Amino acid sequence: VAKSKQTTARKKMLEKLNVEEIRPSSRKYPGIIFSMEREPGNQILEVQDLKAVDTDGTVLFDKVNFNIEKGQKTVFLSRNPKAMTALFEIINGNRSAEAGTYNWGITITTAYLPLDNTAFFDSELNLVDWLSQYGPGNEVAMKGFLGRMLFKQEEVEKKVNVLSGGEKMRCMIARMQLQNANCLILDTPTNHLDLESIQAFNNNLVAFKGNIIFSSHDHEFIETVANRIIELTPNGTIDKLMNYDEYIHDEQIKAHRERMYS
């Protein structure tokens, strides 16, 4: 009897649905696929005794030592968000460290998504010409690439210096895909992205076979992508092979963090 009532209720519910409600979703997801041209070796990145200081004299981090191993997707955390940007700028050769060294493995190729992408868009180039700077391919191929990143046909002639924050971020992600790197460096990558773009980005990073070094404010993004956590402090690092939820709820780590920042 209960089953018969359920069936009747479901039938009534279906009858109430109009065509508007059962239309396919109009949400569009960009085609984000990172692929590696070269398989990485076992030595990815070694950092020794690295130190960075802000322009006002604040120590962002000090005594930073770590060795990134093959297959690791490492999120960097800090109470001072400038610490992660400083680290990423240093290992990309854009900034000098106050002390310490870093060495990339000889098989490693990197693609970097910086926090501030302003300098990339300071030109009168249209989207097709802009993207063509970063990879092989003719105009048709570049238009196809931009189409997968949800740029409409009429938008690809737009000048890059008038793009919105979200459009710039989609261009930067397209640029990274053309680089076919085996190590991705991402400084707060979900900034300016809509939910669909974040989901597409997230899914591809989970599937990516290379290494990822990143920072993010997005809890779900960190939880699903990272398999290693390194926290940068003025007194060294906290370095754990665990997921994000475990890390933030571990009482011993909480106590350790307080000591490291004091």
Language model features by range: what are they?
Residues V1-D62:
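Flexible nucleotide-interacting loop at or near the entrance of a catalytic core
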Residues E37-S262:
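ABC ATP-binding cassette signature C-motif
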